[in-house]
């Protein structure tokens, strides 16, 4: 049987969606983790902080002794049971700490005492993180084609249909606009970058890749910003622009932001709390761009939004939302995107309705 005590083929681990039992403290995990990792800490945040302070003042031996005093008895047993359960659930998993040091080795030894031989990641999260950064830089050097178009043009759907398409907004859990958040919170910046790297590796591994197909994004998608190596390549990339009729764009936006988001909120929180969350979501989206709209126009559109919500609540109709969505597109989103697109006019290689762009992509 192959020795799995230590793993150094980091790309293979990432490509295989290898389960990781991440024994770092919760604060470390929240700052950055790999896709598929579960956080089962050896030490909680306060325990780690105390051990760190002890290390600085008294040295490594004293810090190690303190760690063993903090994680002993019932606490040790509870955490050991959690690691055992995780390994039984994921027998192909690996232990992972920050650098493949004391913490993962301690947990490995404790598990061995119970008869479980769980391998660990040599180099820990730091090694996996460096692999992800290097992979993104390397794969970003391949040719890129961008899909552009005004809000509601179906760009994301078009990207998702391409075998070489990378859904940046899906990875970021955000649709890019002030109304772009979803019910799933965004990942930390490092976790987003790690997830992007794994997606690039997977797509690249399953086909002969001529180029990436990406949506024309700004530097940020919600709270996440695109890696600079990718942004630099996107800035020079050719663009295919979707130009659909305004009415069709409105129907896409109605479905996505009013029908689907209302359904998602009520499904998650129940009718009453879900409606409140849905209303707050729309108000927050409008509030986020109040300065660009001007306070008077913002107040007018807010009143219109309130009336639309009242109509939707009483009758189920989303028609009232068009009274604030149409001017929002005409006065803010469309002029903003067209201005940005004009600066990249030399990069445009195709224009047309959604289906024409889809057909053009197939022919490339």
Swiss-Prot record:
The keyword Transferase applies. It catalyses: 5-methylaminomethyl-2-thiouridine(34) in tRNA + selenophosphate + (2E)-geranyl diphosphate + H2O + H(+) = 5-methylaminomethyl-2-selenouridine(34) in tRNA + (2E)-thiogeraniol + phosphate + diphosphate; 5-methylaminomethyl-2-thiouridine(34) in tRNA + (2E)-geranyl diphosphate = 5-methylaminomethyl-S-(2E)-geranyl-thiouridine(34) in tRNA + diphosphate; 5-methylaminomethyl-S-(2E)-geranyl-thiouridine(34) in tRNA + selenophosphate + H(+) = 5-methylaminomethyl-2-(Se-phospho)selenouridine(34) in tRNA + (2E)-thiogeraniol; 5-methylaminomethyl-2-(Se-phospho)selenouridine(34) in tRNA + H2O = 5-methylaminomethyl-2-selenouridine(34) in tRNA + phosphate. InterPro entries: Rhodanese-like_dom, Rhodanese-like_dom_sf, SelU. Disulfide bonds: none annotated. Keywords: Selenium, Transferase. One of its GO terms (molecular function) is tRNA 2-selenouridine synthase activity. GO terms for biological process: tRNA wobble uridine modification. Its EC number is 2.9.1.3. Residues 14-137 form the Rhodanese domain. The active site is at 97 (s-selanylcysteine intermediate). Monomer. Belongs to the SelU family. NCBIfam families: PRK11784.1-1, PRK11784.1-3, tRNA_sel_U_synt. PANTHER family: TRNA 2-SELENOURIDINE SYNTHASE. This is tRNA 2-selenouridine synthase. It comes from Salmonella heidelberg (strain SL476). The gene is selU.
